[in-house]
From Swiss-Prot:
Protein's gene: AHA1
Protein name (database record): ATPase 1, plasma membrane-type
Modification after translation (UniProt): Phosphorylated, probably by PHOT1 and PHOT2, at C-terminal Thr-948 in guard cells in response to blue light to induce stomatal opening.
Record: active site: D329
Matching InterPro entries: ATPase_P-typ_cation-transptr_N, ATPase_P-typ_cyto_dom_N, ATPase_P-typ_P_site, ATPase_P-typ_TM_dom_sf, ATPase_P-typ_transduc_dom_A_sf, HAD-like_sf, HAD_sf, P-type_ATPase_IIIA
Activity regulation summary: Phosphorylation on Thr residues is repressed by tyrphostin 9, sphingosine, GW5074 and BML-265. By contrast, the fungal phytotoxin fusicoccin (FC) promotes phosphorylation of Thr-948 independently to BHP, thus leading to large stomatal opening.
Modified residues (Phosphoserine): S899, S931
Entry GO terms, CC: Golgi apparatus; membrane; plant-type vacuole; plasma membrane; plasmodesma
Region annotation Interaction with 14-3-3 proteins: where it falls in the sequence: 947-949
One Pfam family per UniProt: Hydrolase
Phosphothreonine found at: T881, T948
Length: 949
């Protein structure tokens, strides 16, 4: 093993020496290693993965106390012991201990939840760990790349991320994308004997290689070792910071006003002033916000993984909630990717060849192992799959690649003659065979006929190789025939597309097939037939019919794109993003990686290549579109919970700051900082349960509308502050409650007033969560059981404190059950108007309030003739639509998009086109039924009531 230690210490240059010497130095053969040798070597070289930085658990725990919101609380704790002295009173130890407890509780919950989420994510990501084909014990098997050691023989094919530094063995040259390592944008050709680096992607070809370096000893490992990972501040973090800053600024304004009024104007005692400032600091900071939001996201991410969508980036959840356009691959996502060939429709273009021979040639030009869907269909059409290699000796197989779009087999027949067969895209095979114009015309006409029936075409050609070498170009190619391929739609695709449109997500089909096939599939799936060949939109030869319309608008209105190349996918995403859409893109191949990276949500479908998975944000573990739509719904529910909480947090900051500030300044009443601390602890304990609350997801794409969050928070918080001020005034300055409810007066007893205000603030503050969590009336939408139980327990504790407490240090005394009942009645009565305020804010912010006030009221308008011409035009257009003179879909073509409500109009228009396509199909069916009935002499009227259109 001393030789292997030299290799580990890099004293032997395995990159330059001849390949045979590599085997000698590594003490291995072309037959690979045994399992035992692999285990022995992993002890020497270590696992084939980069070293992960070990994070100190204690530092991670303390990290949850190191953010702007925590700093404010920590400042309050220091104030409680450092500044809160004077009047011969000791420092405020109760508040200090209470604040520290609150910080520790929050950090503990955050730490535990993040740890659990991290462990769950690690377990899920382990399932996505790079796999590789390795030769061990003389057998090829798929193993995790982490087990590789120098000396292993691996197989590299199109779409693979190369798992370790290796030297290529015999075979065709590889095209490798090294851009992740070297920044070279173009793929590099690597010949047998040359080195390939870990982390680069195979773009073309297939070959075996011997591993020479793994883990931290690879080129990639050394580079990663030198570069420290940079922490990019995500959108979610920016939103969190904005909300935190808003709350801190609100508190700062309140504190500034209190300091100016209390000391220079009112000449209050120093210690009383400090206590009032502590009330604002402790009560106003939403200390639980980072915890609640990260826990909500972690729980949501786990739920998504149970539905078959693994989130690689946690914040992809919020983007998924806002997604309004989904570009979906046709093959495998909208269809089953289970191809079949109708033998009767096979077309032969070569004399002396039967249809069965065309099928045999196609099967010969296919893999018999490690097959893709087309290979499996071709070989599966034979009576016995072994026929694909019967009586011939395989010399060389050219695998499929996105450039040539074909496969080929060079073989020797039983007579010793060399031949080559190829199957692939008809255009490529026609060019290969240098087809005459008349043959080309016949073939293209045949392809169009197939396409009208939704069938894809596969062409087959053959040639003789007189030179008898695999490298020789061979004789002229002969175009043999065309095969029709049928890929049936998934049984749930049509229903899922309908659901997506109802959710405001416009699904656009992306297919490499012809336009006619795309339209036929779109018609079958009920998604409309407004499709374009991507070359006509994005290529150099743009269609003259649509040249006058902006490309962005055409892409936005399209139901799908045909003849799509990977580079077109990137352009489609880019153009949609320029129109302010949140775009999701599905992909599976190595060439989809740029588009997946560019999209707001890159979705790697089930069985995607390593390269596609690496570039995506979400990896699906199950096939089909329904997984994506379920993930959209779940993401919106998660996002809704987060939004509900942020509105609540902003409202509470406003109500605490301005409510207690007004009470302190108008009546010079000093509320106890300790009682605010009790409110904060009970509130935070309850609010943690919102991460599992039952919510109604938004019916349209959703996003962080900070204007709406702040406006709602200010109005609801302001309303609650005013209600508390009115309650205090009524209890302190009037006998209203004594006269109306028969309770004893507490107007001159400050300690009992403290208990009464505490209970009123506690109830209405915590009940606010039911207003912010609902889209309609809060008493109609049932909350989750956990939230309800937590609320009841918290308010029971708050009521018992208010009724029985006798804490001299907190200046609070029990008020009895009579007052508690009165406060509950007051809180319930003042609770209901909050729903009305919530609806009013939403209506005003939507812009419709101003539009109806100014644009449609002639007294306020500035339009010529009071806008009579515009109103007449609107009426005429409505009448034309009503009487069928103008199709409904032509009305309201893409206004300026200012809101998600307008953005979802693209989905509404797609829905209308889909309905027209469906009715057209039914209309065709009805005509067909009537003609058959006439031929058969049936009574159509009796048959008519069996179906409706």
């Amino acid at each position: 093993m001393s030789g292997l230690e030299d290799i580990k210490n890099e004293t032997v240059d395995l990159e330059k020496i001849p390949i045979e010497e590599v085997f000698q130095q590594l003490k291995c053969t072309r037959e690979g290693l045994t399992t035992q040798e692999g285990e022995d070597r992993i002890v020497i070289f270590g696992p084939n993965k980069l070293e992960e930085k070990k994070e100190s658990k204690i530092l991670k725990f303390l990290g949850f106390m190191w953010n702007p919101l925590s700093w404010v609380m920590e400042a309050a704790a220091l104030m409680a012991i450092a500044l809160a002295n004077g009047d011969n009173r000791p420092p405020d130890w109760q508040d200090f201990v209470g604040i520290i407890c609150l910080l520790v509780i929050n950090s503990t919950i955050s730490f535990i939840e993040e740890n659990n989420a991290g462990n769950a994510a690690a377990a899920l990501m382990a399932g996505l760990a790079p796999k590789t084909k390795v030769l061990r014990d003389g057998k090829w098997s798929e193993q995790e790349a982490a087990i590789l050691v120098p000396g292993d023989i691996v197989s590299i094919k199109l779409g693979d991320i190369i798992p370790a530094d290796a030297r290529l063995l015999e075979g065709d040259p590889l095209k490798v994308d090294q851009s992740a390592l070297t920044g070279e944008s173009l793929p590099v050709t690597k010949h047998p004997g040359q080195e390939v680096f870990s982390g680069s992607t195979c773009k073309q070809g297939e070959i075996e290689a011997v591993v020479i370096a793994t883990g931290v000893h690879t080129f990639f490992g050394k580079a990663a070792h030198l570069v420290d990972s940079t922490n990019q501040v995500g959108h979610f973090q920016k939103v969190l910071t904005s909300i935190g800053n808003f709350c801190i600024c609100s508190i700062a304004i309140g504190i500034a006003i209190e300091i100016v009024v209390m000391y220079p104007i009112q000449h209050r005692k120093y210690r009383d002033g400090i206590d009032n400032l502590l009330v604002l600091l402790i009560g106003g900071i939403p200390i639980a916000m980072p915890t609640v939001l990260s826990v909500t996201m972690a729980i949501g991410s786990h739920r998504l993984s149970q539905q078959g969508a693994i989130t690689k980036r946690m914040t992809a959840i919020e983007e998924m909630a806002g997604m309004d356009v989904l570009c979906s691959d046709k093959t495998g996502t909208l269809t089953l990717n289970k191809l079949s060939v109708d033998k009767n429709l096979v077309e032969v273009f070569c004399k002396g060849v039967e249809k069965d021979q065309v099928l045999l040639f196609a099967a010969m030009a296919s893999r018999v192992e490690n097959q893709d869907a087309i290979d499996a269909a071709m070989v599966g059409m034979l009576a016995d799959p072994k026929e694909a290699r019967a009586g011939i000796r395989e010399v060389h197989f050219l695998p499929f690649n996105p450039v040539d779009k074909r496969t080929a087999l060079t073989y020797i027949d039983s007579d010793g003659n060399w031949h080559r067969v190829s199957k692939g895209a008809p255009e490529q095979i026609l060019d290969l065979a240098n087809a005459r114009p008349d043959l080309r015309k016949k073939v293209l006409s045949c392809i169009d006929k197939y396409a009208e029936r939704g069938l894809r075409s596969l062409a087959v050609a053959r040639q003789v190789v007189p030179e008898k070498t695999k490298e020789s170009p061979g004789g002229p190619w002969e175009f043999v025939g065309l095969l029709p391929l049928f890929d049936p739609p998934r049984h749930d695709s049509a229903e899922t597309i309908r659901r997506a449109l109802n959710l405001g997500v416009n699904v656009k089909m992306i297919t490499g097939d012809q336009l006619a096939i795309g339209k036929e599939t779109g018609r079958r799936l009920g998604m409309g037939t407004n499709m374009y060949p991507s070359a006509a939109l994005l290529g150099t030869d743009k269609d003259s019919n649509i040249a006058s319309i902006p490309v962005e608008e055409l892409i936005e209105k399209a139901d799908g794109f045909a003849g799509v190349f990977p580079e077109h996918k990137y352009e489609i995403v880019k153009k949609l993003q320029e129109r302010k859409h949140i775009v999701g893109m599905t992909g599976d191949g190595v060439n989809d990686a740029p588009a997946l990276k560019k999209a707001d949500i890159g979705i790697a479908v089930a069985d995607a290549t390593d390269a596609a998975r690496g570039a995506s944000d979400i990896v699906l573990t199950e096939p089909g579109l329904s997984v994506i739509i379920s993930a959209v719904l779940t993401s919106r529910a998660i996002f809704q919970r987060m939004k509900n909480y942020t509105i609540y947090a902003v409202s509470i900051t406003i109500r605490i700051v301005f409510g207690f500030m007004l009470i302190a300044l108008i009546w010079e009443f000093d509320f106890s900082a300790f009682m605010v601390l009790i409110i904060a602890i009970l509130n935070d304990g309850t609010i943690m349960t919102i991460s599992k609350d039952r919510v109604k997801p938004s019916p349209t794409p959703d996003s962080w509308k900070l204007k709406e969050i702040f406006a709602t928070g200010i109005v609801l918080g302001g309303y609650q502050a005013i209600m508390s001020v009115i309650f205090f005034w009524a209890a302190h300055k009037t006998d209203f409650f004594s006269d109306k409810f028969g309770v004893r007066s507490i107007r001159d007893n400050n300690d009992e007033l403290m208990g009464a205000v505490y209970l009123q603030v506690s109830i209405i503050s915590q009940a606010l969560i039911f207003v912010t969590r609902s889209r309609s009336w809060s008493f109609v939408e049932r909350p989750g059981a956990l939230l309800m139980i937590a609320f009841v327990i918290a308010q029971l504790v708050a009521t018992l404190i208010a009724v029985y407490a006798d804490w001299t240090f907190a200046k609070v005394k029990g008020i009895g059950w009579g007052w508690a009942g009165v406060i509950w009645i007051y809180s319930i009565v003042t609770y209901f108007p909050q729903d009305i305020l919530k609806f009013a804010i939403r209506y005003i912010l939507s812009g419709k309030a101003w539009a109806s006030l100014f644009d449609n009221r002639t007294a306020f308008t500035t339009k010529k003739d009071y806008g009579i011409g515009e109103r007449e035009a609107q009426w005429a257009q409505a009448q034309r639509t009503l009487h069928g003179l103008q199709p409904k879909e032509d009305v309201n073509i893409f206004p300026e998009k200012g809101s998600y409500r307008e953005l979802s109009e693209i989905a509404e228009q797609a829905k209308r086109r889909a309905e027209i396509a469906r009715l057209r199909e039914l209309h065709t069916l009805k005509g067909h039924v009537e003609s058959v009935a006439k031929l058969k002499g049936l009574d159509i009227d009796t048959a008519g009531h069996h179906y409706t259109v």
